């Protein structure tokens, strides 16, 4: 699959914005964009984000190595200052590297395809994100994080085992 990116925070002026990038080969750009060689995964790193040696912003960066990531792929997150200008420059940078803008639900779709989550969890996550009341949070959260998800996973495992035998 291609390398995709998305703004994970609203596209409005704020203190910070977060971009998520995922896909095979995305880590190949870390040295070029951030000036880091072989950074450790799962550590928050402070570094300069550049486009062709032109400084854009001092950002936070976290790398995730697949399959130990949400999508199951190599990925990284960029924590930048939340000005609209910075967001625009980051979008331009990612576009110039050939990254594709992720469609809505793309990261969850990749997590499902890579067996990181099941269908119930994918649907429950959507409900959880869309929840507008505390009742909706509790109901969708129970489905996503609670007993229902575990019971469905156990049931699915039993079906798979019975099909094998």
Residue spans of the language-model regions?
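A glycine-rich (often HGG/GG-containing) alpha/beta subdomain
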Residues: 1-138, 142, 146
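Amphipathic alpha-helical coiled-coil segments
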Residues: 144, 148-162
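Conserved small/polar residues in nucleotide/adenosyl-binding loops
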Residues: 165
């Amino acid at each position: 699959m291609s390398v995709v990116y998305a703004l994970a925070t609203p596209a409005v002026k704020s203190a910070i914005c977060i971009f998520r990038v995922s896909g095979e080969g995305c880590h190949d750009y870390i040295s070029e964009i951030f000036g880091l060689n072989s950074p450790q995964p799962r550590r928050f790193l402070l570094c300069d984000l550049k486009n062709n040696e032109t400084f854009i912003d001092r950002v936070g960066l976290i790398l995730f190595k697949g399959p130990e990531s949400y999508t199951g792929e190599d990925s990284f997150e960029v924590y930048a200052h939340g000005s609209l200008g910075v967001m625009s420059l980051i979008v331009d940078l990612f576009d110039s590297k050939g990254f594709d803008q992720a469609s809505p639900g793309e990261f969850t779709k990749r997590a499902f395809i890579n067996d990181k989550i099941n269908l119930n969890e994918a649907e429950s996550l959507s409900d959880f994100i869309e929840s507008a009341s505390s009742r909706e949070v509790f109901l969708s959260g129970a489905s996503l994080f609670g007993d229902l998800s575990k019971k469905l996973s156990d049931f699915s495992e039993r079906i798979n085992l019975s099909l094998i035998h």
